Amino acid sequence: MFPRCFLFGSDLMDLQLTQRNSISNHGASDSAPMRESDDRVIETSIPARLDDLRWSGFHTRVVLALGITWILDGLEVTLAGALSGALKESPTLQFSNFDVGLANSAYLAGAVLGALGFGWLTDRIGRKKLFFITLALYLAATAATALSWSVTSYALFRFLTGAGIGGEYTAINSTIQELVPARYRGWTDLVINGSFWLGAAMGAVAAIVLLDPALIGPDMGWRLAYLTGACLGLVVFVMRMWIPESPRWLMIHGRPDQAHAIVDDIERSALGRVQDQPQRAWPKIKLKMRDHTPLREVAHTLFVSYRQRSLVGLVLMIAQAFFYNAIFFTFALILTDFFGIASNQVGWYILPFAAGNFLGPLLLGRLFDTLGRRVMITLTYGVSGVLLALSGYLFSIGALSAQTQTIAWMVIFFFASPAASAAYLTVSETFPLEVRALAIALFYAVGTGIGGVVGPALFGALIDTGSRNSVFAGYLLGAALMVVAAAVAWRYCIAAERKSLESVARPLAFME
């Protein structure tokens, strides 16, 4: 367990006393929020103080406790892909390829609706409450999936699991963006999103063991695989007890003193002391606090004030969602139906695939903060699309073996993984704080709904034809979407690297 360096464990109930002491000790400091004659207007340096911090144990704990969402999602998606053969062989479920695609689409449909519903709540009631609610839903639904008795029940529980994960994406992306200093934001976001593939590797290993008929019966292995995910999620509850509410969210929503106390504690954790204004003249912003942001203002912000940014986010999300979900959800079917790989051996092929996906963000991520968003998003989307078209052609003419096909996927997704992560980075940093979570939810939902839900079902149907040329046509569609997204990024992407969130997108509550 992480050492307790600040006030967010069992001391949470004493926060009001802490705030009073903090205000008493630092009330004369210019870093404290200053109220004007209008009690709803404040001047604060909280964003500048958060961005001024060096990387510390606090930030590492935030990344571990919140970033594990992507590990859970990777575990879920990999199990869904690796277990497809086992579900077809299950004496209870007896799935067809269409049933596999349908269940995977149910998971993504749940993620779409969960992102929208929980995204709205995240902006309204706060980040911290939501990342406990969504985790609870994920745990319950994943455990229930292990008890499925029919195609319908399995699809329903996968839908609910997806809803939990979709909600996690909105709450977690918002919180990480708002707590991580600006100069680390791009690399951190990409690596956290890339940690999806650590979960994928875990799922692959679990599938290898749990699907071995010599060890576990054909109708029990896949059930134990889902219980593995639920058990992992229990650990996350403890880890998240130490994570505070976003100070940026608090300062907007009428709780500036609590936000100031939290930043004081973060500074003590990172620096061993609270920074004072005389040591560093932080820029301040003037804000008019609000309880919530009306949906009409949200819609106007996204589709009028930030229409061009919305278009960029939508294109990037649709392209990467179709590209990723269509290929990865049907990964096992390609290996079993076209290359004759036994379903209990698919996990071995996922491991190198997962390695390429994790190494991409890890090795290329820093370039998003140095060379910049526009250059790197264009490069990764464009290269991914071209490589998929080339490998798809080689697949169609039968020039690839199971091993060389896996190597091709590994190289493709070395570039596609940071591209997909950059889509989330783009939509989470280029909109105002008050609508950030809902913006993430909306573009994730639309992108996944169009690209993700359709993709697995389409590829499942293409694979069922038994025609390599039909599958190649699907690959060409995914490649074309990525190339189009690359062109859009080159023309319209925002240069948000190393800039504060408030300078990239001014808060709606900002006052001159």
Language model features with spans:
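Transmembrane-helix signature of 12-pass secondary carriers
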Residues: 2-8, 12-512
